[in-house]
Amino acid sequence: MSARRPIPFVVYKGSGALRLQLLPAEPKEENSPYLKEGCVMLEMSKSKGEPDARGNRIYDWDNKIIFKLSSKDIGDLLAYMKFGAKGEVKLVHDSSKAPGAGDDAGMKNLFVNSTEKSWFWNLSISKEYRISVPVDLSEMVRIQQLLSEGITKIYGW
């Protein structure tokens, strides 16, 4: 396996940003023939408001929400994107139960809702902090393709 990490896919919008990073399968231990399953990390950040002097938006990555997408989560998202793009898909994680849970641990909810030609990715921690990023059709097609291809790398196939 290559030690290089794939390039993250990022969507920047006025309300916030969404970043997907593939973490491929890796060896369980040194010299082990077995692999540890990978994942896709979803990070979302709010916009800090007004653009800087050069017109670039600034995002609050220090207060981002991180959501680890397992192969099952990715399967749920792909099934929604391919077969049920009306309504919403909801994924819930309780990160406080994870070993070594950090300060940002708690109930995390990911909702992906669709309208005619756009999708809204909403990520929240409990009910206290929520980030919403709209995603257009072109971006959603790329997300679907990357997640579909990413499944094979998560399993190391």
Kindly give the residue locations of the regions a language model identified.
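Positively charged, low-complexity terminal tracts
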Residues: 1-157
